């Protein structure tokens, strides 16, 4: 089995592989498909196919601002971004295309982390018949009351989350992106980033996580509506991986999103797996998360 980044499973896959589950893994904000590598490796070693999606202009297509490379913050505040104008329709199209290809070879389990949850909901609406299971890993799951990632973030249940607003470079409205400087050398900014992303990680692992982060995320992705419809998204079996020390999507907000989703589809509620010590990026050891994801292959 092979790992892929941003590419669907081959439609020419041999018949003996047909029926095996493909996991389609969707990264979160300011990230890339490579975020999933430790978990994907575990799943592949257990006999599954895995696709680690790169959303448009992320990962292998990443935009690296010239000013970011040389750490010129004045220039970085105004350098145009090709991510401006991208939105959830683009993200949905990317993931849906991969799901369509993967589904030719067998069942698909779609998993989203963080902002990747809004793509899971949109794709669940678009192609529910192609999805064996959907999973939100400390991810946004919008509802009628909280229809966007922005609305979820602003909910009172997210009050104890760490906001990156003071790390923002430039004007998001003018740039069309939320731009963050992950190469900062300012100790206070690094401490804020660590608390937001992975407070429980050793510093060396924190720096490794930062090295994979991308400066720009389009503001339209946060503002796009992603409420699953009852007759489409609402009929796909679903799981939530709840992280108890998340300072980006607070645990109380995760609980509210789970409760509102379950209230909308009482006959198809979340199966919740609790990781009480996990920060936003999840446990440093990928095995416990992979253990849960592995079980989804057999669940309808």
Residue ranges of predicted features:
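N-terminal export signals
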Residues: 1-13
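The conserved beta1-alpha1 loop
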Residues: 24-30, 54, 113, 242
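Conserved alpha/beta-hydrolase
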Residues: 40-78
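Conserved hydrolase catalytic core segment
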Residues: 106-150
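Flexible "cap/lid" loop of the alpha/beta hydrolase fold
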Residues: 135-179
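Conserved strand-to-loop "acid loop" that flanks and positions the catalytic carboxylate
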Residues: 239-246
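Conserved alpha/beta-hydrolase "acid-adjacent" motif
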Residues: 247-257
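Catalytic active-site module of serine/aspartate enzymes centered on a nucleophile-bearing elbow/loop
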Residues: 264-300
């Amino acid at each position: 089995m092979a790992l892929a980044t941003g590419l669907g499973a081959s439609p020419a896959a041999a018949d003996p592989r047909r029926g095996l589950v493909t996991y389609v893994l969707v990264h979160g904000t300011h990230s890339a498909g490579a975020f999933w590598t430790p978990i994907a490796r575990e799943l592949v070693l257990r006999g599954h196919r895995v696709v680690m999606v790169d959303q448009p202009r992320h990962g292998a297509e990443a935009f690296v601002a010239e000013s970011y490379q040389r750490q010129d913050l004045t220039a970085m505040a105004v350098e145009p971004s090709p991510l401006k104008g991208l939105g959830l329709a683009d993200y949905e199209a990317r993931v849906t295309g991969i799901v369509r290809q993967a589904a030719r070879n067998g069942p698909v389990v779609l998993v989203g982390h963080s902002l990747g949850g809004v793509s899971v909901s949109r794709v669940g609406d678009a192609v529910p018949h192609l999805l064996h299971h959907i999973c939100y890993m400390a991810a946004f799951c919008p509802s009628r009351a909280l229809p966007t990632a922005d609305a979820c973030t602003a909910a009172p249940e997210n009050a104890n989350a760490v906001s990156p607003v003071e790390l923002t470079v430039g004007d998001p409205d003018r740039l069309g992106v939320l731009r963050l400087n992950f190469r900062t050398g300012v100790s206070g900014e690094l401490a804020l980033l660590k608390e937001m992303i992975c407070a429980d990680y050793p510093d060396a692992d924190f720096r490794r996580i930062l090295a994979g982060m991308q400066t720009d995320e389009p503001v339209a992705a946060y503002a796009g509506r992603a409420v699953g419809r009852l007759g489409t998204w609402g009929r796909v079996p679903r799981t939530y991986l709840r992280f108890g020390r998340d300072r980006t999507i607070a645990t109380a907000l995760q609980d509210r999103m789970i409760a509102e989703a379950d209230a909308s589809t009482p006959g198809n509620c979340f199966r919740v797996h609790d990781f009480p010590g996990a920060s936003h990026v999840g446990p440093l050891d990928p095995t416990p998360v992979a253990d849960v994801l592995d079980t989804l292959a057999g669940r309808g």
